[in-house]
UniProtKB/Swiss-Prot annotation:
One of its GO terms (molecular function) is calcium ion binding. Keywords: Calcium, Cytoplasm. GO terms for cellular component: cytoplasm. Residues 1-171 form the TCTP domain. Its main location: cytoplasm. Pfam families: TCTP. SUPFAM superfamilies: Mss4-like. This is Translationally-controlled tumor protein homolog. The keyword Endoplasmic reticulum does not apply. It is found in: Cytoplasm. It comes from Labeo rohita (Indian major carp). Involved in calcium binding and microtubule stabilization. It comes from the Eukaryota. Belongs to the TCTP family.
Amino acid sequence: MIIYKDIITGDEMFSDIYKIKESENGMMIEVEGKMISRAEGEIDDALIGGNASAEVQDEGCESTTVSGVDIVLNHKLQETSYDKKSYTAYIKDYMKAVKAKLQEVAPDRVDPFMANAPAEVKKILGNIKNFQFFTGESMNPDGMIGLLDFREDGVTPYMLFFKDGLEIEKC
């Protein structure tokens, strides 16, 4: 399994269990998810052991159903909010941080990143009202923000991440 982590914070953003594709210019990674519902807080009787029928029936523990996009739920991404002005301020600082990190780990990626990132940012800002914003589990404001949108069908969610803001960890 391959886990994609934020190079700034080390937060897990997504893994290779999803359908992943790279944008034409190689700047963005698009990860397709799906809407899911799952119970949380439920304890499986098989894990407890013993003979449940011989004991007094208990109401069990509270369980809640959580619904959302599988990428967000599985990797504990935290929702945040931006408008055009605040995202512009964030992305300027983020691009500087990624550039500095790339100079350390992949100097050959600095020029392509700085040349192509502004066009991607312009596309994002032009479509900003459609996006939901998610940060990693640590909620570090300096880290990567994943952008969630839905395909034209209105049902299929996908997330966008800056490729150069990710590090790959093989498990």
